[in-house]
Amino acid sequence: MDDTQIEHPRPIPIFYCCYLLRSTVRHASLYIGSTPNPARRLIQHNGVVKGGARRTAAEKLRPWEMVLVVEGFMSRLAALQFEWAWQNPWYSRHLRSEESSALAEVKHRRMRKAKSEDPEFLDSNCDSAKSRVKGTPKKSKRRHRPPRSLDTYFSDLHRLLRSTYFSHWPLKIRFFSGDIYQSWKAWYDRVDVRLRSPVKVILDGSCPEISAHTGGNDTRFGGVENAKITYAAIRDYIEKAIFLLDDPKDVRCHVCQGQIVPTEELTTVCPQAECHCTCHLLCLSRKFVDAALEPNQIVPKHGICPACEATIEWPLMMKELSFRSRAKQELLEILKRKRRVDRKQGAVTGEVESSSRRTVSVDLDDRFGQHAEDEFLLDEDWWEGLAAESDSDTDLRLKPLSKAAPKLETVIEDSECDDADIL
């Protein structure tokens, strides 16, 4: 990791997901991957543009369809962790059953007891280990993956979302295929253990629209191609935060009632359109964690706004805050434009706010509109400079705030953790 990545961290990605592909020709053929841009990734898998995966390159299985996604990952690294665990449930520590853990503990206790009762036990084991080393080394073989049915994928996904590690993440399941959702529902109704309440199910695409499954920011995209993957999705929220914090004279924390200095302190802003609540980051997080009554919780998931009393999601606030605190150049340009208009029209007080809002809105449109993915918002190489590549859209290399790179993308080989069941 170079120094520039440490000094200039990127904003939290507005969208990152793990997806499940299904062949429209052979429904038993399934594939797992991760991406910040599901629409582009799907056309890559279908061979429309270069950059697809070897395991989805067979023409006899194309076209592929994206039937569901697990969204809500706060980084590329987090999505890769979930992707690998879903691809390799036999080796993932997150999916080890309690029975296996108990057997391992019993074996460990027996080993310790044998060592304490027999002093020569350790020497004999060392000798046997040395004899094995002297023998002919075994050739490494590719790990065999047993065939997995759709129900097996559901089971592994269900176990992952209930695991100690992933159950505290703000993850959601979004179905794009109606028959896949019906299969999930039929499978889920037979399971005794329910998913924890934070995990939401969103019906999208060809699924029937049921309002009970959606709410807040969990809106329907209408299809994979309409996924909201840029900061344009929260443009109004960013606008409001900029206006509230631009003049910090009367900005106070609604938790501690202390003065806020936005240029020196991390400040949160309520995402509700009509609420002007501002808080110190630590004050609000402490309030949310205390209200959750979960002793092991460090990062809050959601909470009640101290001003408007609406339930607000912590990840959404952190995305806006990360953009405001890390995309310095974009914010400076927006504020300079706003203040220039304020000075020109300062005499007409009734026109100042509306003109400024229109100007900022246009500027945000330029920054977050249809060309946003050609700047830095969808640069897939920014997170932690990972050397280990996955199927997860590692083939596009774009630099922040530069001219759009050519759309020709290199073909990448699947990593050893890529997964597809071709039956």
UniProtKB/Swiss-Prot annotation:
One GO-annotated biological process of the protein: double-strand break repair via homologous recombination
CDD domains: GIY-YIG_SLX1
SUPFAM superfamilies with a match to the protein in the record: GIY-YIG endonuclease (SSF82771)
GO cellular component, one term: Slx1-Slx4 complex
UniProt cross-references to InterPro entries, sorted A to Z: GIY-YIG_endonuc (IPR000305), GIY-YIG_endonuc_sf (IPR035901), Slx1 (IPR027520), SLX1_C (IPR048749), SLX1_endonuclease (IPR050381), Znf_RING/FYVE/PHD (IPR013083)
EC number: 3.1.-.-
Annotated Gene3D superfamilies: GIY-YIG endonuclease (3.40.1440.10), Zinc/RING finger domain, C3HC4 (zinc finger) (3.30.40.10)
UniProt cofactor(s): a divalent metal cation
Domain GIY-YIG: from-to ranges: 14-96
Any coiled-coil regions, as ranges: none
Broad class of where this protein is predominantly found: nucleus
Domain of life of the organism encoding this protein: Eukaryota
Biased composition (Basic residues): 131-147
Cellular localisation: Nucleus
Listed Pfam families: GIY-YIG, SLX1_C
Family: Belongs to the SLX1 family.
Job of this protein: Catalytic subunit of the slx1-slx4 structure-specific endonuclease that resolves DNA secondary structures generated during DNA repair and recombination. Has endonuclease activity towards branched DNA substrates, introducing single-strand cuts in duplex DNA close to junctions with ss-DNA.
Subunit: Forms a heterodimer with slx4.
Protein's name according to its UniProt entry: Structure-specific endonuclease subunit slx1
Species of provenance: Aspergillus fumigatus (strain ATCC MYA-4609 / CBS 101355 / FGSC A1100 / Af293)
